[in-house]
Amino acid sequence: MQTAKDIFNKTATGKYLAFTLLYLGWCISYIDRAAMNIALASIGKEFSLNPASMGVVLSTFFIGYAIMQLPGGWMADKFGSKKIVIGSLLLWSVFTAFTGLAWSLGALIVIRLLFGLGEGAFPCASFKGIAEYFPKSERPKMIGALLSSNYIGSAIAPLVIAPLLMYLGWRQMFFTIGIAGIVFIAVYWFLIKPAKVQEEEEQKAAGAPPISAKELLKIPLMWQLVIAWFALSLINKGLDSWMPTYLLTVRHLDLKSIGLLTPLPFVAAGLATAMGGWVMDKLFDGREKYLLVTAAALTAFFLYFMYTAETAIMVIAFQSLVYFFKSFVLAGVMAMPMKMLPGTVVGSATGMINVGGQSAGFVSPIIIGFMISAFNGSYDAVFWFLISCACLSAISSLTIKKGDKLPGNTKVAPEVC
């Protein structure tokens, strides 16, 4: 039986308030994450850090972030989204503020690792929140809309961080954004009420056995989605890391031109991510895997044209199309567990998928760097590597089968795929 709080949470007012605050939480996470990237030159100068040391500081975040995906998803499934969202926000806000107290390279690395661990639980908890506050039919489009915050946050971050860094200095800047995160926690705590996933009550009433996080590892669908998103994330993180250098050294753009042109692919990605869940529901309902296959194949197609483009403007145009279609894969792989699996394991399922994405974020820049060095500065091998990654994502998506069995001999949403 639903309580008054649950009824409020399922109304338009309650569920869209929850969505809005989760969206803002994602934006805050990207602002806090970007603060180190923007302030790193100032920090490096104060501590006399070389590029290798600064790279270690940046990479450490992804290690902590990836480690926390599965535990974060499990905790969200067990304790509900509200507690884990607040706990994650608190930890990463505290360690954001603590960054302003750093006294050495070692301190920066430890704080950055703890920051990644703290923030790592948030994505899965936010996806669990969507499962709690929205019915199953609405979840795919809401996941797509929520994930567009990644690109909005990335666009907002320089506008927030740069003035703070300029007028306050890097230490006070970290204190300020850390305190802002704690203020947001208070708002979330008072406005959002805990809710239960509706299917959980139905499952209990029907006597259906619950699925454990461990049993997710036995579901072929999960591994197919992990591989699909890992492969696309190799493209995503690789281009994010190396495109500015490519445009400078190979296409001979100046920094001003790069600053004006490089936001365009992120705008395209934000649009596609926001649309992805809706497109899956309206145009690919019952054929979800074909959205992933088509989007991954088009990503490979436009990567080739990006590689062979004759002008820098055409490179950016094709990169925008690459980002547009690869973002449909992001929206799709995160939305499919919402449609195909019980809401009680949404946190663990999305955590498992995100391990693939974050692992690629750590690996891809290193692989590409070695390729560029091995081929004397040529990016030819890099682009063929990225094209092969898109093909791998398409192949993995194509292997998804209708009606795969879940533990307990029930089926994975047999009406989809």
Where are the regions a protein language model picked out?
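Juxtamembrane intracellular "pre-TM" segments in multi-pass secondary transporters
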Residues: 3-11, 196-226
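Cytoplasmic membrane-interface "Motif A"-like loop-to-helix N-cap segments
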Residues: 78-88, 281-296
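A late C-terminal transmembrane helix in Major Facilitator Superfamily
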Residues: 338-376
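Helix-loop-helix hairpin linking two adjacent transmembrane segments in secondary transporters
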Residues: 146-192
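Conserved MFS/SLC helix-loop-helix module at the cytosolic interface between two early adjacent transmembrane helices
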Residues: 67-105
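Helix-to-loop junctions at the C-terminal end of transmembrane segments
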Residues: 70-80, 274-285, 372
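Extracytoplasmic gate region of multi-pass secondary transporters
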Residues: 36-37, 220-274, 330, 334, ...
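Cytoplasmic helix-loop-helix junction between adjacent transmembrane helices
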Residues: 111-150
